Amino acid sequence: MVETQKYWFAARTLSKQEFAVKKRIENLNLEEGIDVECYLPTRTVISQLKYRRKRSVVPVARGLIFIHATKQSACDIHNVYGVQGFYMKDFSTHSMLVVPDKQMQDFMFVMDLNPEGVCFDNEPLTVGKKVTVVKGEFSGIEGEIATEANKTYVVIRITGVLVASIKVPKTYLKAIND
C-alpha cells in the first residue's frame, strides 16, 4: 500500500548549506517530478562593512529546513537523490519528527508577515494558557501566552524543533478552552 498522506518534517542540513539543500530539492521537483516542497524561514540582515552596508538574506535557524512530503518521498530525497541532510527524531516514537500542519501554517504565516518581529528561543519561555490572537495582523494564530519584562508574547511551538514568540497586546488575545 502506497501512502499518499503528506507531512511536514524537520531536517538538519550541513553547516551553511540551507540554501543549497532548498535549491536542490526545488530542482528535483522540476527534473524528477517528485512531489516535495520545502520551507526555509529567512530574514534580511544588514551588516556594516567599512564604508558601506551589505544586505543579505540569512536563515532564521541555522541548519534547519522543513520538508513537506510523504514519508517515502522524504526518505528518497536523501537516500536515492543524495541531498545532504538529516531528519530530526521524535524521541517518544523513535521515528522522523512530524510537525503538525496547524503549527507549520502558523509559523509560516508569522515568518512571511513579519520575520524581524519574531524572537527565537530553544529554551521555552514561561508556559501559560493556550490563546488565539483575535485582532491585528497575527489574527488566527494559536499559541501559549508568556510574559517577559512586563511584555506579553504569544509563543508558537514546533514541538521538538524550536520555539518562536511574537509580541502581542493582551487585548488582542482570547483564551482557548480545552
How would you name each of these model-derived features?
Residues 152:
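Glycine-centered loop/turn positions within well-structured domains
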